[in-house]
């Protein structure tokens, strides 16, 4: 088979000009082919959709505008269908329809590769699905790091999600793992320079759990609130590191308790994120030059 010579020439020129990789993080397909998506969305912005009930206070349909990329976590994909998605817990905790949606690019820890999904019976009970994560469309796998270092968070070759209960992180915090840490690390790896936070309430109560229906026992609510306090300390410590790498995180969650990042109104964030692709579209003249207008007929001689 003859290959296209212009494609070959462009490939050779690109390989010759390629700069050394600055981010050693690798992703893996279900067949464990190694890929890098470093800088894939270079310089763009994304909305990180967490699960706080304040999600119900904003018009999420605005996120369907051209130019806007969203990343969901956990079951926030039941509230808004994201472009990207990630998790750190067992895959069976997350709604199977999201897993089966080929239009959502999913980033998943490698240990979840062979784990089963779950489905819900009509009576609300759960059972194992016939499908495993590796059989789902649009899935990439990543390796996690078990140590959080606020001075190296964006530069390692794996994805930090917190520490185990026996070892302290760079701030002296033990445990306190979170999918939010993973999402921010992945978004930076993908090249996003600005991340807008939604559903980042950083407080949970018996009457304010999630943006979707779900039960939470009192001890789980206490655990989450303790986690939020530790994450707030980590994010305060990360601010100089983020500034050094020109990575902006902006909180657009109404009533959020997280004060580590600057706040912005949701509508203003949508306007900024969609501006580049928000101009009116004309389809004329892209395939062929527009025909010149016919000259105006001359006035009849008198």
Task: Report each predicted region and the residues it spans.
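Metal-ion/cofactor- or nucleotide/acyl-coenzyme-handling active-site neighborhoods
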Residues: 1-302
């Amino acid at each position: 088979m003859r290959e296209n010579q212009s494609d070959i020439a462009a490939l050779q020129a690109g390989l010759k000009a390629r700069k050394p990789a600055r981010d050693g993080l690798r992703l893996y397909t279900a067949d464990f082919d190694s890929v890098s998506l470093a800088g894939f969305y270079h310089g763009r912005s994304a909305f990180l959709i967490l699960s706080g009930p304040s999600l119900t206070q904003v018009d999420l349909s605005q996120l369907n505008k051209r130019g806007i990329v969203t990343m969901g976590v956990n079951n926030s994909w039941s509230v808004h269908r994201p472009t990207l998605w990630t998790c750190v817990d067992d895959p069976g905790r997350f709604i199977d329809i999201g897993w089966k949606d080929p239009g959502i690019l999913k980033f998943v820890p490698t240990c979840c590769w062979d784990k089963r999904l779950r489905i819900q019976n009509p009576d609300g009970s759960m059972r194992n699905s016939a499908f495993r994560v590796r059989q789902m469309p649009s899935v990439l796998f990543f390796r996690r790091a078990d140590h959080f270092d606020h001075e190296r968070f964006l530069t390692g070759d794996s994805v930090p999600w917190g520490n185990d209960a026996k070892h302290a992180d760079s701030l002296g915090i033990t445990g306190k793992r979170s999918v939010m840490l993973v999402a921010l690390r992945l978004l930076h790896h993908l090249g996003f320079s600005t991340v807008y936070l939604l559903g980042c309430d950083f407080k949970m109560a018996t009457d304010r759990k999630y943006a979707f229906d779900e039960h939470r026992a009192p001890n789980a609510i206490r655990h989450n609130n303790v986690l939020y306090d530790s994450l707030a300390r980590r994010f305060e410590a990360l601010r100089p590191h983020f500034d050094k790498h020109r990575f902006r995180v902006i909180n657009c969650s109404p009533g959020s308790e997280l004060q580590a990042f600057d706040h912005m109104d949701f509508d203003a964030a949508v306007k900024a994120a969609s501006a580049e692709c928000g101009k009116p579209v004309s389809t004329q003249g892209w395939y062929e030059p527009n025909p010149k207008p016919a000259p105006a007929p001359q006035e009849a001689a008198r």
